[in-house]
């Protein structure tokens, strides 16, 4: 392991080691994330489903040698779920830290996936952490935790899912350094599929070409297009011995739509590429 000194903060660089999560850089996102961490700035990642947002955060946590606490946000996720709560047991009552509090105490990364799904009261907790104060107030214990230099708050969401009822308020969004992700260009996506699915370049190219054809059908009754994740699933199934048509039905057509006619239309595209 080697260390790169950055303004008195040492960054342990572990990228490329056998257990490093694979990530294919597409631009300057690694440098931007690293500089944001160096300056104590939170990061907002927005992009469609399955484009690599979570894998990127895992990759950067490994690269920076930081503990990573990932929270999959949902409608019932409250501030108490993030901060912690009192529990009652045989030995009495005790306080249990939530994932956000643990990340602050340990100086790690707290990653809130699909943050707009969480309840509105979470913003009250996140705002002091996401501005110059970098503080977490635990109302139930009276603690005010000052985030150490290593702590970083990272959130993500899919802009395509936003509506009038669920969206990130400008007062929250403007506290973050924002990064926009999308599906990779052809050559990079082929490398990703080949690496993740452990298939040869020819099959990866064929699957990616199919995925791009399906993405052009976005306006045809599809809520979401074929993600890189689904292309990887498809390639893995084909590698394991499933026929291409069966793999594409199970890993692409059916996950993309519940409507039988739409599924049939998607399979027509599959037949063109895997006749």
Curated annotation (Swiss-Prot):
Residue positions binding ATP: 47-54, 107-114
Compartments where found: Cytoplasm
Pfam families, per the entry: AAA_5, CbbQ_C
A molecular-function term among this protein's GO annotations: DNA binding
DNA-binding region: 249-268
GO CC entries: cytoplasm
Highest taxon listed in the record's lineage: Bacteria
Keyword list, A-Z: Activator, ATP-binding, Cytoplasm, DNA-binding, Nucleotide-binding, Transcription, Transcription regulation
Chief location: cytoplasm
PANTHER family per the UniProt record, alphabetical: DENITRIFICATION REGULATORY PROTEIN NIRQ, MOXR FAMILY PROTEIN
Family membership: Belongs to the CbbQ/NirQ/NorQ/GpvN family.
Function: Activator of nitrite and nitric oxide reductases.
The protein's name: Denitrification regulatory protein NirQ
Species annotation: Stutzerimonas stutzeri (Pseudomonas stutzeri)
Record lineage: Bacteria, Pseudomonadati, Pseudomonadota, Gammaproteobacteria, Pseudomonadales
Gene: nirQ
